[in-house]
Amino acid sequence: TSDRIVDVTHPTGDLVAQHYLPTTADVETAVAAAWAVRAEAATTSAAKRAAALMHVSNQLQARHEEVARIITDEGGKPLMWSRVEVSRAVSTFRWAAEEARRFSGELQRIDTDAQSEGRIGVIRRFPLGPVLGVAPFNFPLNLVAHKVAPAIAVGAPIIIKPANKTPISALILGEILSETDLPT
């Protein structure tokens, strides 16, 4: 971890939190860790991925007001809109949980001419490697959710870089994800 500290401040100027900026070595460690769990993440069952995603959705719902207030504190968004953002993230994780069960392959007929009569093609979908997500400040939870949830749904490790000025809601999401059985 670097010695460069970033202040997270409310638009009123009140200090909300502080965090360290990552070093190049921190980023390299994260990338190496993501590649190291790639095979395990890709072979994690759809049921297990869906359960983890539902856990996140349920925990965000249970902590709805707390997370909304954090979004307001860290970014100055009106509380009403922060609540909407948390609701959207809850829905995003729920949708991803449903999609995790549908992420599979398919069979297609490829008998388009006489030489291929009776043949089928197998289409198999699988993650190619880790995903890197960079999230902006204006929707610090929902736009992180839109990157993290689909990556988990398909079995891809993800490294997320939240905005420096609004990282707390992403950290809460990481905390909730750490409660699951997903590979880390």
Describe the residue ranges of each PLM region.
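Terminal low-complexity tails and localization/encapsulation signals of metabolic enzymes
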Residues: T1-H19, A51, H55, S87, ...
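Glycine-rich, flexible loop/turn motifs
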Residues: R4, V37, G75-K77, E99, ...
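A general secondary-structure boundary signal
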Residues: I5-D7, A68, E175, E179
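N-terminal hydrophobic or amphipathic segments with adjacent small-residue motifs
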Residues: V6-D7, E28, I70, R83, ...
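Glycine-rich loop-to-alpha-helix module at the N-terminal edge of alpha/beta enzyme cores
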Residues: G13-S104
